[in-house]
Structures are given as C-alpha cells and as structure tokens.
C-alpha cells in the first residue's frame, strides 16, 4: 500500500483531506483511494476510485445503502466523478490492486494489512482458475467465437 499523502492536499483534483474528514465520521473499517488518480495516469474521463470496507455485521442491504450515501456525499470533493465501491464486492484482482497500490484514506494499518493478507491468499488459491479462464478466452478469440 502506498503511504498516505500526509499534507492532506489534493491528488489530481481530489480534495483528499476533505474526503478523509468525511470518511472519519462514518463507520467504515477502512477506505482506500486507488486507480488512475493514484498511479498518475489520468485522462479527461478518469473517475476517482475509492474502496470502502464496512463492518462485517452489516447486511448486504445496509452496506449498499451506506455505500450509496457516502458515494453521493463525496461527489463534491473532486472535479471528476467519484466511484465508491464496497471492496468486498470488487473482483479479486481489483481489490488486490487497491490494497497493493492504493492510498489509505482512513482506517487502521493493521486491519488493512490483515485484510490484504486474506485477499492475497484467496488470489493465490484461485490463480489456476484465472489462468484456465484466460486460456479459454484466448482460444475462443482465436476460433472467432467472440
């Protein structure tokens, strides 16, 4: 995980300090800024990607409701569209990339590290399946089935 921008200023037209203040007032376990804004390779249609981790005890409906509320609230803190995701609902490779390269907005480093270890283990366990799917896709492309 990339270290947070300690001065709390903006990253590519994102008011990181304001987003941190807002998220600190919620019950998210942690939040990460990730994607093109962190990598520094934005273009005019780039959005602002934020992954949230909610408490485990929340129902799927409550997680959805809270994510939508936070998503709406954060729109004013960036020039582009803010795309807020529940990290538990992200595809495994994207969640892993957010944990590897993202910037911590709020949350405890130990909790983020523990979740990262869990995602890494799951990623390794499913490597053969991903490789099989990739090869099948390439074969279908070569045959003109896609």
Regions found by a protein language model. Give the residues of each.
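Catalytic core of pol beta-like nucleotidyltransferases
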Residues: 1-26, 30, 39, 57, ...
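Catalytic metal-binding acidic patch
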Residues: 35, 40-60
């Amino acid at each position: 995980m990339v270290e947070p921008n300690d001065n709390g200023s903006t990253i590519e037209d994102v008011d990181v300090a304001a987003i941190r203040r807002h998220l600190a007032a919620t019950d998210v376990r942690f939040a990460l800024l990730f994607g093109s804004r962190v990598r520094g390779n934005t273009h005019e249609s780039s959005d602002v990607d934020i992954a949230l981790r909610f408490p485990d005890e929340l129902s799927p409906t409550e997680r959805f409701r809270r994510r939508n509320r936070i998503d709406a609230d954060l729109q004013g803190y960036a020039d582009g569209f803010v795309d807020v995701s529940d990290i538990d609902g992200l595809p495994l490779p994207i969640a892993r990339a957010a944990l590897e390269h993202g910037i911590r907005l709020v949350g405890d480093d130990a909790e983020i590290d523990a979740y990262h270890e869990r995602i890494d283990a799951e990623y390794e366990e499913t490597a053969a399946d991903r490789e099989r799917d990739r090869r099948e896709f390439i074969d279908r492309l070569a045959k003109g089935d896609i």
